[in-house]
A protein has these predicted regions:
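Active-site phosphate-binding strand-loop segment of PLP-dependent enzymes
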Residues: 129-188
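PLP-dependent aminotransferase-like
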Residues: 93-153
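Conserved N-terminal alpha-helix of the aminotransferase class I/II PLP-enzyme fold
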Residues: 34-77, 101
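Conserved small/polar residues in nucleotide/adenosyl-binding loops
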Residues: 227-231
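Active-site pre-lysine segment of PLP-dependent enzymes
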Residues: 162-175, 186-206, 210, 214
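N-terminal "arm"/small-domain region of PLP-dependent enzymes with the aminotransferase-like
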Residues: 1-53
Length: 231
């Protein structure tokens, strides 16, 4: 019987190429010795729950990088960012427009805030995967139900399908409501000419990204970026 650390070490030394998260792909990137920098909330190192110093500065640099007004670091992956964004944007027992292929965290938020959802169904592509959500779908749904307080979609999806965020954001804003984008698989967007632009710069009001999915970051690390979001 092997111990967990032994199994992990053996896997790390194997010739298996990891087509899975996290995005660092087990590459030996330069990084300080882990135990030497593992601390708690001590003087000079701020508090993530109420950042005022070095963590606040780091989050502001991330906000500048992604093009948002505010950015908050998360340590429970994208899930808590999705929960926080939906709970902040929609009052309890309110109404929300959600893509039917949303992550289960969206449904968790609906349950927590006792929300009623109208659903957007993405078209199924010829490959058998769920495709885009279109601005026209959003427009039609919002005209039908003016009580909806926010729109939440996933872009890119697990399969890499990207919706027209700019068009959807414009529609949502015409109706005076925010667009929340679960971009957990899109933390790399906007970096390099071959990638599409990130959802923040395309007009979304709250964007949740998982750095550990597509970038060289540790598991569970994620930021949520806000431009204009209020309940």
């Amino acid at each position: 019987m092997r111990y967990l650390d032994q199994a992990l070490e053996a896997y790390g030394k194997s010739d298996v190429y990891p087509f899975h998260m996290p995005g660092h792909k087990r590459n030996p990137l330069p990084f300080p010795e882990v135990y030497g920098i593992d601390i708690t909330e001590i003087d000079g190192f701020d508090n993530l729950h109420h950042a005022e110093g070095i963590l606040k500065e780091a989050q502001q640099r991330a906000a500048d990088l992604y093009g948002s007004a505010h950015c908050y670091y998360l340590v429970n992956g994208s899930t808590c960012g999705i929960l926080a964004s939906i709970c902040a944007a929609v009052k309890k027992r309110g109404r929300i427009l959600a893509a039917r292929n949303s992550h289960k965290a969206v449904y968790h938020a609906l349950f927590l805030s006792e929300l009623t959802a109208e659903y957007l169904y993405p078209a199924v592509t010829e490959c058998g995967i769920q495709g885009q959500i279109t601005p026209r779908q959003v427009e039609d749904a919002l005209k039908k139900d003016p009580e909806i307080s926010a729109v939440v979609i996933t872009s890119p999806t697990y399969e890499g399908v990207i919706s027209d965020i700019e068009g959807i954001a414009k529609v949502a804003h015409v109706h005076g409501i925010p667009l929340i984008v679960d971009s957990a698989h899109g933390a790399h967007l906007g970096f390099g000419g071959e990638f599409p632009q990130n959802a923040v710069r395309l007009g979304a009001d709250a964007v949740i990204e998982s750095l550990h999915k597509t970038l060289p970051s540790f598991t569970q690390t994620a930021p949520v970026s806000y431009t204009h979001l209020r309940a």
